[in-house]
Amino acid sequence: MSARGKARNRALDVLFEAEQRSLSAFDVLRSRREKTDQIVNPYTLEIVEGVVSHQAAIDEFLETYSQGWTLERMPSVDRIILRIGTWELLYNDDVPDGVAVSEAVALAKTLSTDESPSFINGLLGRLQQLKPSLLA
């Protein structure tokens, strides 16, 4: 797994734990740093900060374009993967659009249900098509 792939995976862990425990993602990061004295990968931190700062808009896009699904109905891990993928797709110009989608699908293949990769691919693919109008 690439360094960025590991960073995505760690960001997913942080965001997932924060959601499950009703904590701030930054509190989870701080707690992990204190417990392990590990240096947090800068890209992990960038993802967490990006998702947190754009979460309202990201969630609105996901609610609007996930046909027949609400965020609450989605498996938690899918919701977090979609938030990371949407942030990379719409708000991080350093990641090519296709890479953002394929990396999100790869996370879903290893961490979620059998149906999740195609759902995530379809939803992020739709957001990729609409990207110019979403950011206008």
From Swiss-Prot:
GO terms for biological process: DNA-templated transcription termination; transcription antitermination. Gene3D superfamilies: NusB-like. GO terms for cellular component: cytosol. Keywords: RNA-binding, Transcription, Transcription antitermination, Transcription regulation. Pfam families: NusB (PF01029). InterPro entries: NusB-like_sf, NusB_fam, NusB_RsmB_TIM44. One of its GO terms (molecular function) is RNA binding. It comes from the Bacteria. Involved in transcription antitermination. Required for transcription of ribosomal RNA (rRNA) genes. Binds specifically to the boxA antiterminator sequence of the ribosomal RNA (rrn) operons. Belongs to the NusB family. This is Transcription antitermination protein NusB. It comes from Arthrobacter sp. (strain FB24). The lineage of its organism: Bacteria, Bacillati, Actinomycetota, Actinomycetes, Micrococcales. The gene is nusB.
